[in-house]
A protein has these predicted regions:
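N-terminal pre-Walker A segment at the start of P-loop NTPase domains
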Residues: 2-8
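Flexible phosphate-sensing "switch/lid" loops adjacent to ATP/NTP-binding sites
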Residues: 3, 15, 23-28, 37-186, ...
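Pre-Walker A adenine-sensing motif
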Residues: 9-18
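Conserved glycine(s) of the Walker
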Residues: 33-34
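Phosphate/pyrophosphate-binding betaalpha-module
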Residues: 192
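Short conserved motifs of the RecA-like P-loop NTPase core
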Residues: 199
């Protein structure tokens, strides 16, 4: 304020940019609800309908912003060219591996106009529980019953829940049924016109049998654990489901900023958040993993950490996708908007 700046909480009518193409927005009520697998499911549906899709990702303003005005990612090499952090890679890499082009940056009108040149449909891939930057034809919002009640307790996540055309209650296969019911009741109370889809996100591990009886270090998506307030993620579920003998406490092995992360977020005890906001922090994450006394590392992050870190022990990746019934339900909603063409 001393410099004369004004600060306001802006509404969607003031901030959303209109596209010349149909827009499907995927947002959430909290970090770590499952936007990423929902976005991947939506792009898969659109491609099966013969549509060209451009995914536009919510900004993550790290580094020199003057070099990030309008970014286009079509290959894994593009992630290196733009010096992407682990957090950025976690959002971009799964899209790229699925054959999707991702746009990001800081000038979101310019980004939209570039994306429109390549696409029949724009996918807004939300982040930070923020509202869509683009005016959507279909607003899909993901909620998490592992954090029941958060859908009406956090801003701007609750704003998304109130604006949604479709609310996808994710992770119902691992959540308490009463918590699923609580989320559904809250959504019906604040947004009675929203269509509700109950979804599961089953986890899978290649060579899962090798987990049984092992002492396992679990590495999870960082933001989900930290400002998302989760105590565990897909890696922890995979370890439990596949008979790990021990889930190793990572805290005694943490160094530098990773150690400070555990101090700042004391609810995180059994899993290691994959923090990587720069080269130094990536190195500290690598050192923490390599120092851990374990037989196996289970990586529950959306990216292949093995491409970025030199891990000195066996490691397995955990993946997760939406289940087919929820994908079918999403397809019905998308066809309703796009006319099934």
């Amino acid at each position: 304020n001393a410099a004369g700046a004004d600060f306001r909480i802006m509404g969607h009518k003031s901030t959303m940019i209109a596209s010349t193409k149909p827009v499907i927005a995927v947002c959430a009520v909290r970090t770590g609800c499952g936007k990423s697998q929902t976005s991947r499911a939506v792009t898969g549906i659109l491609k099966s309908m013969g549509k060209r899709v451009a995914a536009v990702r919510h900004p993550m303003p790290y580094g020199d912003l003057t070099k990030q005005i309008c970014q286009r990612f079509a290959s894994l090499e593009d992630l290196d060219v733009h010096h992407c952090t682990i957090e950025e890679r976690e959002e971009y890499e799964p899209h790229i591996r699925a054959g999707n082009v991702v746009f990001a940056g800081i000038d979101y009108e310019r980004i939209l106009r570039e994306a429109e040149k390549e696409a029949d449909v724009i996918l807004w891939d939300g982040g930070n529980n923020d509202m869509s930057f683009y005016r959507p034809n279909l607003y899909i919002v993901v909620a998490d019953p592992h954090r029941a009640g958060h859908e009406v307790r956090y801003y701007p996540g609750e704003t998304n829940a109130r604006m949604a055309d479709v609310v996808l209650i994710n992770k119902t296969g691992t959540a308490n049924p009463e918590d699923v019911k609580t989320v559904e009741q809250n959504i019906k109370r604040i947004n009675p016109n929203a269509r509700i889809i109950r979804a599961k996100s089953p986890v899978s591990v290649e060579n899962a049998a090798s987990i049984k009886g092992k002492r396992v270090l679990v590495v999870e998506d960082g933001p989900t654990l930290t400002h998302g307030d989760m105590k565990f993620g897909a890696g922890h579920i995979a370890a439990k489901n596949n008979g790990a003998a021990v889930i190793v406490d990572p805290r005694p092995y943490a160094v530098g900023s990773i150690k400070k992360t555990f101090e700042k977020y004391p609810h995180v005890t059994e899993v290691l958040p994959a923090m990587g906001y720069g080269k130094k922090q990536m190195k500290e994450l690598e050192q923490t993993i390599n120092a851990a006394d374990c037989d196996l590392v289970l990586i529950g992050t959306p990216i292949d950490l093995g491409r970025l870190l030199k891990i000195n022990k066996p490691a397995l990746r955990v993946t997760y996708e939406l289940d087919q019934p929820s994908i079918n339900a999403l397809k019905t909603e998308i066809e309703r908007v796009l006319g099934g063409a």
